[in-house]
């Protein structure tokens, strides 16, 4: 593989373009609409090349792609997207009823959050239980297991499109082994067990290297054995991030927890105190300090209304693990034609009424306890498969032991002290800051779709997975509207970026356009 850095000159270590950090007031959202207007002759020869280069996008290779790509068509009774607890339970229940099942998992390993959460299922760890279910599914001839496979599009008549990474991870592979494969799957029924995505809390300089999602830090430690820092701050508005602090403690690292909520005694708080972990209630990170990486953080004790600070201080740290609660992954449900509704309990959108033969379950449907997700998986898998096979084998619901979490804090963005104005990024991929959203609303944009296009909020390749809800909350606060009145933007396929080679498949070279020889030839 040949890799080159982009959007930097002459190097990442010393980037001349970083001077824009000091000129940020001159580059707000939509500045190019007002700046590059005259002369007209400069539009295509000067202004457009400048803007495109400044956008930081990669350059497509001019070399011929020597890899092999394939397309495949498949049919099944039930397609299950995601192999977390609800996905495994639904696939297992459906397979027991004799249905032809395809289980698709984006990551190399099956299990989802069971690989990282400290839970017990039938006196087994979550990881062991998931491995047991997978080993049983592998023995069933009516089950197809596909890891490294992302279902990225939901189209009419229950047609799903899946992107499989076949050979990317293989060091030695046959020349006939494709790099990637595109699947067109027609399913009689579809279960969307796509889980949820942790969202950040917005604060100053939150794009500094060393700022990570709390769940990512935990997964690095538990799955890959990697510490993201040795002086971590856990900045959270909910209980789930405490599990990351516990994992740091297991690895002989002393974390500090900043909890935006007032002092309370939930199970995880008591456990943290018993472990000797320092907790600061009603605190949050105001600004991350550091140029190439986080070196310290300015933190503050929030007032009752959370609009200012009682006191501030600076503490040393080398990483900030952030958790602003969880957002159900509703992209595929929305693509299917399902209209979303706002759930005030979790402050997020969830699927409403199905338009096609699909059911959304588990965390993707706003159920965040393990007991609920497993029960919904067994129930939905059994019900949908029994309609197809006329069989209804009884499933024993496993006994689950898990930590009970208390209510999260409805708090998404840290205020700033007077005379301080660091960038507070909402969309990390498109560099959309709080100030950009404020400008869009100040200039008369009211529809969330217009705000999206003016600021490019949620228009990057991640489609705003971590930014959309924070952006909606900010628009609702500024406009004095509730989030359902603001609405949400449209989710479109592909859910994740895919290569052009996968889309094209074998239709390359002379196969791209059929040439019919004439009689003369």
Name each model-derived stretch.
Residues 1-18, 25-521:
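Residues forming the flavin
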């Amino acid at each position: 593989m040949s890799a080159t850095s982009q959007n930097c000159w002459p190097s990442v270590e010393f980037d001349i373009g970083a001077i824009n950090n000091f000129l940020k007031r001159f580059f707000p959202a939509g500045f190019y609409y007002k700046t590059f207007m005259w002369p007209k002759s400069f539009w295509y020869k000067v202004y457009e090349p400048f803007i495109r280069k400044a956008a930081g996008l990669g350059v497509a290779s001019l070399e011929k792609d020597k890899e092999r790509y394939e397309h495949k068509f498949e049919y099944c009774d039930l397609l299950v997207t995601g192999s977390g607890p609800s996905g495994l339970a639904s696939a297992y229940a459906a397979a027991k009823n004799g249905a032809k099942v395809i289980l698709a998992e984006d990551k190399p390993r099956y299990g989802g959050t069971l690989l990282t959460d400290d839970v017990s299922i039938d006196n087994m760890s979550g990881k062991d239980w998931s491995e047991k279910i997978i080993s049983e599914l592998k023995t069933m001839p009516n089950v197809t297991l596909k890891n490294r496979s992302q279902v990225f599009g939901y189209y009419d008549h229950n047609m799903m499109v899946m992107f499989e990474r076949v050979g990317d991870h293989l060091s030695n592979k046959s020349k006939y082994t494709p790099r990637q494969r595109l699947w067109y799957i027609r399913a009689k029924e579809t279960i969307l067990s796509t889980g949820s995505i942790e969202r950040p809390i917005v604060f100053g300089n939150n794009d500094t290297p060393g700022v990570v999602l709390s769940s990512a830090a935990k997964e690095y430690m538990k799955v890959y054995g990697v510490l993201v820092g040795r002086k971590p701050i856990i900045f959270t508005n909910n209980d789930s991030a405490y599990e990351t602090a516990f994992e740091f403690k297991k690895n002989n690292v002393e974390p500090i927890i900043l909890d935006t909520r007032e002092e309370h005694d939930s199970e995880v708080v008591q456990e943290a105190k018993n472990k000797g972990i320092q907790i600061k209630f009603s605190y949050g990170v105001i600004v991350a300090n550091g140029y190439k990486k986080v070196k310290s953080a300015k933190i503050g004790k929030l007032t009752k209304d959370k609009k200012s600070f009682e006191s501030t201080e600076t503490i040393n740290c080398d990483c900030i693990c952030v958790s602003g609660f969880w957002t159900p992954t509703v992209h595929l449900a929305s693509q299917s034609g399902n209209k979303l509704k706002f759930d005030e309990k979790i402050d997020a959108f969830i699927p409403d009424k199905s338009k096609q033969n699909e059911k959304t379950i588990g965390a993707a449907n706003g159920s965040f306890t393990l007991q609920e997700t497993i029960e919904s998986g067994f129930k939905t898998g059994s019900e949908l498969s029994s309609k197809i096979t006329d069989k209804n084998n009884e499933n024993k619901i496993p006994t689950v032991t898990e930590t009970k979490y208390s209510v999260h804090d409805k708090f998404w963005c840290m205020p700033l002290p007077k005379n301080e104005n660091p960038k507070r990024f909402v969309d990390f991929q498109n560099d959309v800051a709080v100030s950009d959203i404020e400008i869009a609303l100040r200039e008369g944009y009211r529809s969330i779709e217009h705000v999206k296009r003016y600021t490019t909020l949620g228009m990057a390749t991640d489609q705003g997975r971590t930014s959309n809800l924070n952006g909606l909350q900010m628009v609702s606060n500024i406009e004095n509207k509730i989030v359902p009145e603001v609405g949400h933007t449209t989710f479109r396929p592909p859910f994740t970026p895919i290569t052009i080679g996968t889309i094209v498949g074998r239709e390359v070279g002379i196969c791209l356009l059929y040439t019919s020889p004439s009689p003369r030839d």
